[in-house]
Amino acid sequence: MKKILIILCILILSCNVFSCEFKNGREYTEKHKVISNIPSIIEFFSFFCPYCYEFEKTYDTQYLIEKKIKKNINIQKYHVSFLGGKLGYVLTKSWIIAQQMGIEKKIVLPIFKGIQETYTINNLDDIKKIFKEKAGVSESKFNSFWNSLTIKILISKQEEDIRKYNLKNIPTMLINEKYVIDYSKIEEIFKDSFAEKYTKLIQFLINKKEKI
């Protein structure tokens, strides 16, 4: 009986510490009134965002989420078009095509590098070249995806979601359509053990219940 009480006390204390570790307005922000019933994560980024590039190279957030959080979660990654002018839209559409092909990991860093380091990506043909060199995608296959109705529907939905969430900063993560994580804030707060605290924060928000 004594052992059971000790275990219960430890669990209660650990839960309290965990819940107090993260605060609304500090590590995350409550964005919307209604929480989604389906656990979901949406990452927002741009190939024109230097901070997004550094974050992708250093932490590989997709890997952290998939490997560290043991739960069936709908994970999406949206490229925003409000940076980069016309090329921003072209990159958004190309990113959706890469997702549909399942080749995101092969092209994400080469595109970042081409945009921000070598300055070798300036138009759609340059993007097609990356797809071919890094993922073996022929121009005809790329074009068939580019002109497909599916891609048009997906890009319309994504742009509608971005407008709905009214995001101001990137990179940003939206959890359960309610909680927003601004990477620029948490990197400094979590600097000593970022990956561990970052995944704990995501888990905390995924499991967070609305107060009735």
UniProtKB/Swiss-Prot annotation:
GO terms for molecular function: oxidoreductase activity. Residues 1-19 form the signal peptide. SUPFAM superfamilies: Thioredoxin-like (SSF52833). Disulfide bonds join 49-52. CDD domains: DsbA_DsbA. It holds the Pfam family DSBA. InterPro entries: DSBA-like_thioredoxin_dom, DsbA/DsbL, Thiol_disulfide_DsbA, Thioredoxin-like_sf, Thioredoxin_CS. Keywords: Disulfide bond, Redox-active center, Signal. Involved in disulfide-bond formation. Acts by transferring its disulfide bond to other proteins. Belongs to the thioredoxin family. DsbA subfamily. This is Thiol:disulfide interchange protein DsbA. The lineage of its organism: Bacteria, Pseudomonadati, Pseudomonadota, Gammaproteobacteria, Enterobacterales.
